[in-house]
């Protein structure tokens, strides 16, 4: 990608308001250029339709209504080519076929770890 962290534009999707605030605070501490948050898969789809230029989407998996897998698939079908990173508390997920089927690029485990976020943002 070649962008500096300060130039990145991220969309964070989580149905839990505390998790959204935590991610937003961490990303702002890291000097991420733009951080937008939405609280549902449908909200993410609406946001991508309005602004398809986000560099990355951090997508919670377990959400009511439309889970992160389904939202990611729909976003990809809209033509979004940026990175989609799954956000999950399920540490027992060893089968990554669901992530691949949803066309997700990486996985972050909750609770989020600053070093893992840096790795994902810098694509290490």
Annotate each predicted stretch with a short phrase.
Residues 37-46, 68:
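Helix N-cap/capping motif at the beta->alpha junctions
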Residues 52-58:
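Active-site beta3 strand of CheY-like receiver
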Residues 63:
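Receiver (REC) domain active-site loop signature in two-component systems and cognate sites
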Residues 60, 88:
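Active-site residues of response regulator receiver
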Residues 46, 69-81:
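Short amphipathic alpha-helix used as the core "switch/output" element in two-component signaling
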Residues 17-36:
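Two-component/phosphorelay signaling modules centered on CheY-like receiver
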Residues 112-121:
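C-terminal output helix
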Residues 14:
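Conserved acidic carboxylate
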């Amino acid at each position: 990608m070649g962008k500096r962290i300060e130039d990145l534009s991220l969309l964070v999707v989580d149905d839990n308001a505390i998790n959204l605030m935590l991610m937003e605070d961490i990303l702002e501490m890291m000097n991420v250029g733009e951080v937008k948050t939405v609280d549902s898969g449908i909200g993410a789809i609406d946001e991508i339709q309005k602004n398809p230029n986000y560099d990355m989407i951090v997508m919670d998996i377990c959400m009511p209504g439309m889970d992160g897998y389904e939202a990611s698939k729909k976003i990809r079908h809209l033509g979004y080519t940026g990175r989609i990173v799954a956000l999950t508390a399920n540490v027992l997920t060893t089968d990554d076929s669901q992530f691949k089927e949803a066309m997700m690029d990486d996985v972050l485990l909750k609770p989020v770890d600053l070093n893992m976020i840096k790795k994902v943002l810098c694509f290490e």
